[in-house]
Amino acid sequence: MACFHLLSFGAMCRAGLLGNRCVAEGNRWEIRCQHLQFSKHGYNASSQLMFGIRPRLPISEEDRQWTDNGFDQLSRLLGHQRMLHAKVVLPDAEHFPDRYDRSIAAAEKMFCRVCEYMDLDRRRVDFEVFPDATDELRDLVPYWQSSQGGCAGLYVHPEGEKDRMVVALRQSQMEDPLAVVATLAHELGHVILLGGGLLERGAKDMEPLTDLLTVFLGFGVFNANCAARFRQWQNNQCQGWSMQRLGYLPEEIYGYALARFAQERSEQRPPWASYLSTNVRSYFKGSLEWLQAENKRAKGAIT
């Protein structure tokens, strides 16, 4: 019988044994990494245009403009080249070769790798794990302030300590390695934007922009797949289902953001898209077809 502590992160992903719980806003849900394959024909917006059919964008025009403006803002803050050269991080043994046994030590190894992929100096950021009980957290981290007692992770920059930042992970979050990476990528995004003085904490849309940053820096597969989770359960007496969220952006916007990411990098058939969950990949595919069609239409108008 396979034991989780004997499997690497990548092996767990391939075997479909990726944890049982993920915590966001105090909720838990089952999670499973879904490896989906491209159709043999790929994404073909040209065939639709040939018959006068224009692909339909799966998000609203308002959401599209927000996402595009977010990419433009991040390009101004970090440089467009940073996105173009970002390493796309995937849930496999190549990117996370260490054994994951849900311990603090294993989570810290994962934290170090996420820091490396996000081009952050790990020595500037302390890693902590906080208990689920809010009262215990206040004793452990007295400078913590939050109205969200069920948050999955925390970023703290203590007053008067310019060079010290803390990223903390909720203890029950460690059950799920995919959600660990997604949460760490988001909180380390705060290190880049807030700790780096690029944004103020009270900036408009600071949290969703930080989620968008995870796509910009190559962690979109993790954060998009963790955005919404469907869970079914049953016992001898009853059965039911639930849907829970992690993060601030919905799957639809993640799908478009990933398509914009791929287009900016001239990736027409990115292999990493096979790691997207069913819903996200559908939104990604529709968005990429729309972007390709708009690009062809714009070129036709110019000529």
Task: Go through the PLM ranges and name each one.
Residues V167-T183, D205:
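Short pre-active-site segment immediately N-terminal to the catalytic Zn-binding motif
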Residues V181-G196:
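Active-site recognition of the HExxH zinc-binding catalytic motif
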Residues K204-Q237, W241:
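Post-HExxH zinc-binding segment in Zn-dependent metallohydrolases
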Residues L78-K162, S172-L178, N223:
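Auxiliary, metal-adjacent structural segments of Zn-dependent hydrolase domains
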Residues F51-Q81, Q239-T303:
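Pan-zinc metallopeptidase signature
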